[in-house]
């Protein structure tokens, strides 16, 4: 049997955050994840809180947590608290900074808007260096939207038309510029089938890189905001974006594209690299299929690839995600947590799972379904609390990450809070030094 201090189940942003925090504290950590996480589909920004459950828009996310506590006392933020939520987010920022993916937030602690691929504005709190933090006051003379010939995963006309609906941008010129990148013929496939990661590889060629720089400098000025799809990546995206800015002297705003999202991949690669370099053990491509329980404790877990070799730990953190990641499974009449059969908060009347209208002014109820936890994020199983198991991230009940714009923030805050409680148990059991 393999034994660890902390075993983390799930390799998304919550799972990696929990594993890294425990590893930084000197614990022996194993991380088990089945495959690619939802970070491959993410914007690469961290949303803390964009709206309250009643639909009120949030400007200062941490200040709004007191109002959130009143509206949703079972919300994960309400259980973690403002102080620990802030500490968790700032810890994450420092961790990514040290992994060479610096994230920025507004000096006054407010949300900023990021321009999405659809040309809408979305509240967020932490963004990557080449995501323009728009707050309603344009400090650019024009918006230049880059269209790459043959690349279908970015629709510049849609972005331009939607962005032009903003009243404060009504008098700001918006131009679409077409850019051709040589070398597509070397891929031996239809250039219209290329993805962002294909273009990222292509731009490693000097001729393709120089062609991109030359075309951008011919059409854009330093006082423009140049919006382009995130096509710099595959391990060195931020370095290449910095190089592009230095060569062209232009100001860029990257927008994520259809998956794979290179902005999200940057974060996952940074977290993975930090975990492995820190000495963590990762079972990638494996899946936890069950566990052994003794009273109120989880004593061991079993994986699909290591059926005859159970993994035991003093503490377990579960971050298997929601429906998308199969951390929750929905049948015709019920929602289940499929690994340990943990108790799930849900409405037994399926007719009450959603509103009559798909596009509704309030959150659909099924989005708030998830694993039931106590104030310390311990789940229960058949009504009995599991004392050495913590749940975090999208599998939790009591919130809607999409409607409220808080998915990344909740994942980080709950993971950090869970591990801080684990570390506190070690501090309590530490034997006092004997002075001779």
UniProtKB/Swiss-Prot annotation:
SUPFAM superfamilies: FAD/NAD(P)-binding domain. Its EC number is 1.1.5.3. Keywords: Flavoprotein, FMN, Oxidoreductase. Coiled coil: none annotated. Its cofactor is FMN. It catalyses: a quinone + sn-glycerol 3-phosphate = dihydroxyacetone phosphate + a quinol. One of its GO terms (biological process) is glycerol catabolic process. GO terms for cellular component: glycerol-3-phosphate dehydrogenase (FAD) complex. It comes from the Bacteria. Composed of a catalytic GlpA/B dimer and of membrane bound GlpC. Belongs to the anaerobic G-3-P dehydrogenase subunit B family. This is Anaerobic glycerol-3-phosphate dehydrogenase subunit B.
């Amino acid at each position: 049997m393999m034994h660890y201090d902390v075993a983390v189940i799930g390799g998304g942003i919550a799972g990696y955050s929990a594993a890294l925090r425990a590893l930084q504290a000197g614990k022996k950590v194993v991380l088990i994840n089945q495959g690619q996480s939802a970070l491959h589909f993410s914007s690469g920004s961290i949303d803390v809180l964009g709206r309250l459950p009643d639909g009120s828009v949030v400007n200062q996310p941490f200040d709004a947590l007191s109002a959130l506590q009143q509206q949703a006392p079972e919300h994960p933020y309400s259980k973690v608290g403002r102080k620990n939520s802030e500490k968790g987010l700032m810890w994450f920022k420092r961790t990514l900074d040290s992994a060479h993916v610096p994230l920025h937030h507004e000096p006054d602690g407010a949300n900023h808007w990021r321009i999405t691929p659809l040309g809408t504005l979305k509240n967020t709190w932490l963004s990557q260096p080449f995501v323009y933090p728009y707050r309603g006051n344009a400090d650019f003379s024009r918006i230049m939207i880059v269209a790459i010939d043959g690349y279908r995963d970015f629709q510049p006309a849609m972005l331009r038309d939607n962005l032009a609906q903003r009243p404060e941008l009504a008098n700001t010129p918006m131009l679409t510029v077409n850019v051709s990148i040589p070398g597509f013929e070397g891929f031996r496939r239809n250039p219209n089938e290329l993805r962002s990661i294909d273009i990222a590889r292509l731009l490693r060629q000097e001729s393709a890189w120089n062609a991109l720089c030359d075309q951008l400098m011919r059409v854009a000025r330093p006082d423009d905001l140049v919006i382009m799809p995130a096509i710099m990546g595959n391990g060195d995206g931020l370095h290449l974006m910095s190089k592009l800015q230095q060569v062209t002297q232009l100001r860029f705003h990257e927008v994520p594209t259809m998956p794979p999202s290179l902005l999200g991949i940057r974060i996952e690669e940074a977290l993975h690299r930090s975990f492995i370099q820190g000495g963590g053990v990762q079972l990638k491509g494996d899946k936890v299929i069950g566990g052994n329980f003794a009273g109120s404790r989880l004593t061991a877990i079993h994986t699909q690839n290591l059926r005859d070799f159970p993994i035991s730990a003093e503490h377990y953190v579960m971050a298997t995600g929601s429906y998308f990641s199969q951390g929750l499974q929905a049948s015709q009449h019920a929602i289940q947590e499929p690994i340990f059969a943990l108790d799930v908060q849900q409405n037994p009347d399926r007719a009450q799972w959603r509103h009559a209208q798909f596009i509704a002014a309030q959150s659909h109820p099924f989005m708030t379904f998830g694993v039931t936890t106590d104030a310390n994020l311990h789940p229960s199983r058949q009504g009995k609390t599991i004392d050495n198991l913590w749940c975090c991230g999208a599998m939790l009940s009591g919130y809607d990450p999409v409607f409220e714009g808080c998915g990344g923030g909740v994942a980080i805050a709950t993971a950090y809070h869970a591990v801080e409680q684990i570390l506190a148990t070690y501090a309590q059991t530490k034997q006092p030094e004997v002075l001779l």
